[in-house]
Amino acid sequence: MSIYQSIQDFISLALQNGTIEPLDELYHRNQLLHFLGLNDWAEVDKEVHETNSLILMDQLLAIANENNVIAKGQDEFYEAALMNFMTPRPSKINHDFWEKYQASPDDATQYFYELAQQVNQVKTRDIARNIAFSHLTKYGKLEITINLSKPEKDPKAIAAAKLVKASSYPACQLCLENEGFYGLGNKPARSNHRIIQVSINGEDWGFQYSPYAYFNEHSILLNAKHQPMEINKRAFDNLLGFLDKFPNYMIGSNADLPIVGGSILTHDHYQAGRHDFPMAKAELRETIELAHFPEVSCGIVNWPMSVLRLASENQVELSKAADDFLKKWQVYSDESLQIKAKSTDGTPHHTITPIARIRDGKYELDLVLRDNNTNEKYPDGIFHPHPALHHIKKENIGLIEVMGLAILPARLGTELLEVEKYLLNQDNQMDEIHKAWAEQLKNEEHFTRETVHATVQGAVGEVFEEVLKDAGVFKDTQEGHEGFRKFIDFVNQ
């Protein structure tokens, strides 16, 4: 296929998805020719030959590289800017989204998600590189992902980033100002990035899809204002308010304290999507009667972390009950279990990771109790993955991990292969951090070429289960169960 046919097909897709009108075609072609370093044209077939936008993207990037248009280390930015030629303006996308929303929220999100994939805002090919498997436990089937989707920056890109003058615009990666931002240095390319403007409880928010999605239709609801994360009644109201608009999705929030929170605490945001997480599938271990909220059902979830599940048809009462749990947890201590609400200087240590969904016609809130205390033995966190597990997971246990989906570092993609070689007594370059774990595995089982891969994956799953247990404040033991009931009694006073 000629380069001009590739360009024409690219333009035809832009016509089809509403980026341009027929009267814009010549203008769009000439802008694209200049962008690719071309100044000529040959008439081609108007019938589309290639309908895959990512294949066309590759073909046009190859043309640009041949013409030396892309500066060293600028591939990421140029690629996003190229796909911007195929991405409708924000006003067009918002208009079409809310028009489709009149038919159903499902129609609207399906339109936006499919478009985000077509224009490479959601990087489907990178996401497909992730290694994913599951591990069965007494709590249900945990999901494990080794995150290979985010490409490592090459040395040229790193060198180029150092030369870029520092900028405070946009203030962070979640600000609305990222929409259409070309990018520079360590600020990601967002030329083809689009955001849906949405009102939740009278406040302005943006709804977007995550470029490197961790689960199906992984999306982010971000505050129009750059302000810190905070878990409070307003947060519960926002989660439930989002469900009123998008009942087809679940939504949750990272905790708002270091160690137990996510990687971005400086910008108020929540994460949503269409995925039935392992924790959502978990049954109740026991039911609880709430003395002050008779319209709200409650129970303790059979889960390695400490989770309360509240449900009600009455959204107002449900939010009040969740807020009551939060306020009581923020002042509750049980030093026999190393649970301490505040330091002597008043520093708070207790918060909640909340998750909301609609199930069987009721609003449902899962409240995961979090404690970010540290001590001499566990300087990274008492209720954080303990050192023996750091060879697999040492990062914060955020919202997604809490719900039973492990996001493990890319290094494990190669490191675990070396562990497998070690277990088979083959020449290997196994990292020393895995030595004790691998020795333990070797002593427990005989490995063959046919069994080693699945067995190592199972062992990784066992580590993730232990990670979640470490993060649980009331352990799944008799002592932990009794401690949990004491807290419930405190709430019911």
Curated annotation (Swiss-Prot):
Which GO biological process categories is it annotated with?
Answer: galactose metabolic process
What InterPro entries would the database entry show? GalP_uridyl_Trfase_II (IPR000766), GalP_uridyl_Trfase_II_CS (IPR023425), GalP_Utransf_C (IPR005850), GalP_Utransf_N (IPR005849)
- What cellular component terms from Gene Ontology apply here? cytoplasm
Instruction: Please report the organism this UniProt entry assigns to the protein.
Output: Lactococcus lactis subsp. cremoris (strain MG1363)
Protein's name in the database:
Galactose-1-phosphate uridylyltransferase
What pathway does the annotation place this protein in?
Carbohydrate metabolism; galactose metabolism
One Pfam family cited in the UniProt record for this chain: GalP_UDP_transf
| Molecular function GO labels | UDP-glucose:hexose-1-phosphate uridylyltransferase activity
Name the family the entry cites.
Answer: Belongs to the galactose-1-phosphate uridylyltransferase type 2 family.
Report the main location listed first in the record. cytoplasm
Keyword set for this entry? Carbohydrate metabolism, Cytoplasm, Galactose metabolism, Nucleotidyltransferase, Transferase
What catalytic activity does the UniProt entry give for this protein? alpha-D-galactose 1-phosphate + UDP-alpha-D-glucose = alpha-D-glucose 1-phosphate + UDP-alpha-D-galactose
Q: Known EC number(s)?
A: 2.7.7.12
Q: What class of enzyme is it?
A: transferase
Fetch the NCBIfam families from UniProt: galT_2, PRK05270.1-2, PRK05270.2-2, PRK05270.2-3
Which compartment or compartments is the protein found in? Cytoplasm
Question: What's the superkingdom here?
Answer: Bacteria
Gene transcribed to yield this protein: galT
